[in-house]
Amino acid sequence: MSTTPTIPTIKLNSGYEMPLVGFGCWKVNNETAADQIYNAIKTGYRLFDGAEDYGNEKEVGEGINRAIKEGLVKREELFITSKLWNNFHDPKNVETALNKTLSDLNLDYVDLFLIHFPIAFKFVPIEEKYPPGFYCGDGDNFHYEDVPLLDTWKALEKLVEAGKIKSIGISNFTGALIYDLIRGATIKPAVLQIEHHPYLQQPKLIEYVQKAGIAITGYSSFGPQSFLELESKRALNTPTLFEHETIKSIADKHGKSPAQVLLRWATQRNIAVIPKSNNPERLAQNLSVVDFDLTKDDLDNIAKLDIGLRFNDPWDWDNIPIFV
C-alpha cells in the first residue's frame, strides 16, 4: 500500500491541529462529490472544507464515511469544516442548522464551524428550502434580521461546550469586526477564512489576525479561476494567475506548476489552503506544496501583484457593506 504524504499542521488556539492543505468542497458536484472526497482521502487529504450553503454535505459525508468504514482513515484523523449560513444567525436557529449539517454528514461533531458571512438574512425553515442560498422567504427579495454577531457567536460557544464542535471561527470578516468580536467572546475565534490570492493580499489584516493568535485559511487561491464558471464579469476581465508572467517564471525556476507556486505562496506564510481538483495528478500536486520554498525575491515579486481585487463581495448581492 502506498504511503500518503505527511501534511504539516497549524496549531489552533483551541488546542487542535489543522492541516495546512485541505480539499475545498465549494462547487463540487453532488453526483461526483462522494467519490471525489473518498479519492482525496486515499490521496492523503485530511482537511475537508465544506458549508451548509454548498448543498453537498450529504454526498461529502458519504465519501467520508465510506473511507472510515473501509479503514482508510479514522474519524479523529480527519478535520471537517462546515459553515453556518446567513439565514441561521438567530441564536435559536444556530443549533438547528448545525444539527442539519451533522445529520447530512452523518457525523457526531465537526472539527471547525465558521460563521460564513457577517450577515444575518431572515430565517427560512429547513423544510421550506435548504440550503436557502439567497432566498429570504420572498422570491428574489433580500430580507434581514437584527441579530448582532456576538449573539450568534455565543450560541456557537454553547455548541462547543456541548461537544458538537471542536473549534469555532469566522469567514469573510474584516479587522474591525474581529477586533470587536474578540472583546465580547469567551472563546476566541480559532480560524479566519478569507479570500486570498496575489490580486487580494490583505497584508495588514493577516498581520493583525496572526498576531492575535488566530489561524488563517485562504480560499480562491487561484484568484479569478474559481469565479469563471459563475460568469463573474470581474473574473472574466481579469488575467488568469496561471498565465501571469510573474507566476509562470517562478514556477519554471522551481520546476513546479503555477498552481503549486500560488499554494506555496500561502502555506509558506502559514496560511492554510483548500483547493479542489477532479484530476488525480493535480490532487496529488496540490498536496505536495510544502516540499519547496519560494525565495525572498519570489515573495517580493508576488507582493507587487496586489491590486486589492476582490471577487467575492456581498456588495454585488444587495449592496451589503461588509468590505466598503
Curated annotation (Swiss-Prot):
Recorded metabolic or biological pathway in which this protein acts: Carbohydrate metabolism; D-xylose degradation
One biological process GO term for this chain? Answer: D-xylose catabolic process
Site (Lowers pKa of active site Tyr) residue list: K83
Listed GO MF terms: D-xylose reductase (NADPH) activity
Q: Which domain of life is it from?
A: Eukaryota
Keywords (alphabetical) are:
Carbohydrate metabolism, NADP, Oxidoreductase, Xylose metabolism
- Which residues of this UniProt protein bind substrate? H116
Keyword Oxidoreductase included in the entry's annotation? yes
PROSITE patterns for this protein: ALDOKETO_REDUCTASE_1, ALDOKETO_REDUCTASE_2, ALDOKETO_REDUCTASE_3
According to its UniProt record, what is one Pfam family this protein matches?
Answer: Aldo_ket_red
Is the Cytoplasm keyword given for this protein?
A: no
Its recorded reaction(s) are: xylitol + NAD(+) = D-xylose + NADH + H(+); xylitol + NADP(+) = D-xylose + NADPH + H(+)
EC assignment: the record states 1.1.1.307
Query: Which positions does UniProt annotate for NADP(+) binding?
Result: 171-172, 220-229, 276-286
Catalytic residues, per the record, are Y54
PANTHER family in UniProt: ALDO/KETO REDUCTASE
Q: Which family does it belong to?
A: Belongs to the aldo/keto reductase family.
Q: What does this protein do?
A: Reduces D-xylose into xylitol. Preferentially utilizes NADPH as a cosubstrate.
Give the protein's recorded name. Answer: NADPH-dependent D-xylose reductase II,III
Species source reads Candida tropicalis
Q: What is the lineage of its organism?
A: Eukaryota, Fungi, Dikarya, Ascomycota, Saccharomycotina
This protein's gene is called xyrB
